[in-house]
Amino acid sequence: LLLTSTADVLRLVTSSAADIQVHASWVDNAAGTITPARQNTIISTATTTTVVPSPGASTQRNVKGLYVTNNSTGTSCTVAVTHFDGTNTVELMQFVL
């Protein structure tokens, strides 16, 4: 999944107050210089959360992995993965954890 503008982000929309844990990993390409990175995010409320931030100017971000788990005991949560380009939000997938 490519994020190619400074407005592109990946977000998670969670439906309930569950213990949602997210790991994202990516590589940035800035004029041929490749830089790996990652981010861990803990979500504990029903909210919209950016889990992969936008790349810098003149940089393309290639998201290599997005791992989402529900560590709650007994609380299910509907999770939507969305791409926001600064104007439009597109739902990429939705599932119940």
Task: Outline where the language-model segments fall.
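Surface-exposed, low-hydrophobicity beta-strand/loop segments enriched in small/polar/acidic residues
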Residues: L1-L97
